Amino acid sequence: MARQDYVFTSESVSEGHPDKLCDQISDAVLDALLAEDPAARVACEAFATTGTVVIGGEIGLSDKKKLGEYMGRIAEIARNTIRDIGYEQEKFHWNTCHVHNYLHEQSAHISQGVDRDGAGDQGIMFGYAVDETPELMPAPIQYAHAILRRLAEARKSGAEPTLGPDAKSQLSLRYENGKPVEITSLVLSHQHKDESQTSDDIRAIVEPYIREVLPAEWLTERTEWWVNPTGTFVIGGPDGDAGLTGRKIIVDTYGGAAPHGGGAFSGKDPTKVDRSAAYAARYLAKNVVAAGLAKRCVIQLSYAIGVAKPLSIYADTFGTSEVPEAEIERAVSRAMDLTPRGIREHLALCRPIYRRTAAYGHFGRAPDADGGFSWERTDLVEAIKREL
């Protein structure tokens, strides 16, 4: 039996965090290519530091003649992404930073296996769901995201003009009988523009927004608040710390509450099972919990490069289900085609829906009308039940 009484901590980072900025650039490039060619193959990495962005990786297009045309748009895509995030600092400005593009054509040896509908690489992928929030996500990561998303809204609307784009949050939640009941500590480090602002000044700005998104009963007189605990946080973003695509994989997923296969998501087209199979695993786990078959569920999938069918499917419900895990494994494998092509088609992944995933979590988001976050739907519930 899993522990019922404990304190668990998760962190999130804002869209202006250097690593998240790079994730968004990588996914903006991916979206631009998928918008023109749904069969585009993309593996795009970005690196950002003071005044500079470097983009590299591999792309493959159905019409190779258009490769040069797309290459000419990369710098503009990167600048627009940086502008949207809000970087207009002296040493990192969307309009003046140097953008170096080293993207090149994808290896034919990689593409040949994928062209036969096999997986784009070997690997293991995990999906997770738990009934402690309406989104069926772990509460610490879900609310750590919510804090930063709300503060970004306030900054971008002009309501809080002294806040900068770079920020991090961290929540420690105390659980009783397996349910979150109290925030024991709350950490927020938020970039600001005025060097004269103190930690107390920043807390006065951010606290109303934090209280707006958190359940009121979780904040008690015992909750420790740590807002900009080091003091001044004016130098931020890539000018303060270099950023790199794919370095926030725990922030992107479940905040450490579930295993991670190690593969990052951003910049990868959906033939890459690092991304698409992780989305499918979340979809399956969420539908198992939504079906009432378990209060908590993790699903693992594994693949080999060039091989279509998953090598293994594993489920664990942590003692919260009356249905044997082996039966759940069989049911989910029958309810959905888990080949890479089957996943792409079932979740309609070959479209420009990825930049929005690159900040504030890939999971626990509301499905969009245009097909974004399709893996958050609970439309597989009846199919899974029929297979049991």
UniProtKB/Swiss-Prot annotation:
**Which residues does ATP bind?**
H17, D166, A167, K168, D241, R247, K248, A264, K268
Q: Which reactions is this enzyme annotated as catalysing?
A: L-methionine + ATP + H2O = S-adenosyl-L-methionine + phosphate + diphosphate
What is this protein's gene name? Answer: metK
Organismal lineage: Bacteria, Pseudomonadati, Pseudomonadota, Alphaproteobacteria, Rhodobacterales
The metabolic or biological pathway listed in the UniProt record of this protein is: Amino-acid biosynthesis; S-adenosyl-L-methionine biosynthesis; S-adenosyl-L-methionine from L-methionine: step 1/1
HAMAP family of this UniProt entry?
S_AdoMet_synth1
Entry GO terms, CC: cytoplasm
Q: Which UniProt keywords apply?
A: ATP-binding, Cytoplasm, Magnesium, Metal-binding, Nucleotide-binding, One-carbon metabolism, Potassium, Transferase
Q: What class of enzyme is it?
A: transferase
For binding L-methionine, which residues are annotated in this chain's numbering? E58, Q106, D241, K272
**GO terms of biological process kind:** one-carbon metabolic process; S-adenosylmethionine biosynthetic process
Ranges for the region named Flexible loop are 106-116
Determine the domain of life of the protein's source.
Answer: Bacteria
The note describing how and how many cofactors are bound reads: Binds 2 divalent ions per subunit. Binds 1 potassium ion per subunit.
Q: Please describe the quaternary structure of this protein.
A: Homotetramer; dimer of dimers.
The family annotation for this protein states: Belongs to the AdoMet synthase family.
Gene3D superfamilies, alphabetically?
3.30.300.10
Its Enzyme Commission number?
A: 2.5.1.6
Q: Where does K(+) bind?
A: E45
Q: What is its main location?
A: cytoplasm
Q: Where in the cell is it found?
A: Cytoplasm
Q: Please tell me where Mg(2+) binds in this chain.
A: D19
Q: Which cofactor does it need?
A: Mg(2+); K(+)
> What protein is this chain from?
S-adenosylmethionine synthase
